[in-house]
UniProtKB/Swiss-Prot annotation:
<dbReference type="GO" id="GO:0090729">
    <property type="term" value="F:toxin activity"/>
</dbReference>
<keyword id="KW-0800">Toxin</keyword>
<dbReference type="GO" id="GO:0099106">
    <property type="term" value="F:ion channel regulator activity"/>
</dbReference>
<dbReference type="Pfam" id="PF21947">
    <property type="entry name" value="Toxin_cobra-type"/>
</dbReference>
<keyword id="KW-0872">Ion channel impairing toxin</keyword>
<dbReference type="GO" id="GO:0005576">
    <property type="term" value="C:extracellular region"/>
</dbReference>
<dbReference type="InterPro" id="IPR018354">
    <property type="entry name" value="Snake_toxin_con_site"/>
</dbReference>
<comment type="function">
    <text>Binds with high affinity to muscular (tested on Torpedo marmorata, Kd=0.4 nM) and neuronal (tested on chimeric alpha-7/CHRNA7, Kd=0.95 nM) nicotinic acetylcholine receptor (nAChR) and inhibits acetylcholine from binding to the receptor, thereby impairing neuromuscular and neuronal transmission. It also shows an activity on GABA(A) receptors. It antagonises GABA-activated currents with high potency when tested on primary hippocampal neurons.</text>
</comment>
<dbReference type="InterPro" id="IPR045860">
    <property type="entry name" value="Snake_toxin-like_sf"/>
</dbReference>
<feature type="disulfide bond">
    <location>
        <begin position="50"/>
        <end position="54"/>
    </location>
</feature>
<feature type="disulfide bond">
    <location>
        <begin position="24"/>
        <end position="44"/>
    </location>
</feature>
<keyword id="KW-0629">Postsynaptic neurotoxin</keyword>
<comment type="subunit">
    <text>Monomer in solution, homodimer in crystal state.</text>
</comment>
<dbReference type="InterPro" id="IPR054131">
    <property type="entry name" value="Toxin_cobra-type"/>
</dbReference>
<keyword id="KW-0964">Secreted</keyword>
<feature type="disulfide bond">
    <location>
        <begin position="69"/>
        <end position="80"/>
    </location>
</feature>
<keyword id="KW-0008">Acetylcholine receptor inhibiting toxin</keyword>
């Protein structure tokens, strides 16, 4: 009986650890919202760059979830992080 109980406890701990998901801000929806990332995507990212309207509108911002930090192009700023809601829009208060 003790062996069965110990086995159940170990299995529960392993399953809880494997089931961790991160919450990231995303620009895939309008307005910007926080979403639970799919399994395997355990990073939040923020990409920023200037387009033709940068001087009047500011930088374009892309937020989302990723399995690995997106590659940075020469004209982009890319940051990645691994805690819930760690990638807020620059004009948005963290939270």
């Amino acid at each position: 009986m003790k062996t069965l109980l110990l086995t159940l406890v170990v299995v529960t701990i392993v399953c809880l650890d494997l089931g961790y998901t991160i919450v990231c801000h995303t620009t895939a929806t309008s307005p910007i919202s926080a979403v639970t990332c799919p399994p395997g995507e355990n990073l939040c990212y923020r990409k920023m760059w200037c387009d033709a309207f940068c001087s009047s509108r500011g930088k374009v911002v892309e937020l989302g979830c990723a399995a690995t930090c997106p590659s940075k192009k020469p004209y982009e700023e890319v940051t990645c992080c691994s805690t819930d809601k760690c990638n807020p829009h620059p004009k948005q208060r963290p939270g």
